[in-house]
Amino acid sequence: MANNKSAKKRAIQAEKRRQHNASRRSMMRTYMKKTVAAIAAGDKEAATAAFAVVTPILDRMATKGLIHKNKAARHKSRFAAQIKAL
């Protein structure tokens, strides 16, 4: 456990950041699941709409460092290919 003032402050900041990141990651996964569900249902319009929502979210998470930029690119590419195939 933190023994001095600065270490205690860093521990508090790290916990706040962890909770914030967990919330953002959960939100990202929720929108990704909505996109996957729309693709699985075969509804091209709903899938396109969900993809339009999830794309900037993935980009934002990559910019903020929650996910790697290649992971965001991979998800966007695969979603686009799956929607195109509908």
Curated annotation (Swiss-Prot):
Pfam families: Ribosomal_S20p. The keyword Thylakoid does not apply. It comes from the Bacteria. InterPro entries: Ribosomal_bS20, Ribosomal_bS20_sf. GO terms for molecular function: small ribosomal subunit rRNA binding; structural constituent of ribosome. Residues 1-27 are annotated as: Disordered. Keywords: Ribonucleoprotein, Ribosomal protein, RNA-binding, rRNA-binding. Binds directly to 16S ribosomal RNA. HAMAP family: Ribosomal_bS20. This is Small ribosomal subunit protein bS20. The lineage of its organism: Bacteria, Pseudomonadati, Pseudomonadota, Gammaproteobacteria, Vibrionales.
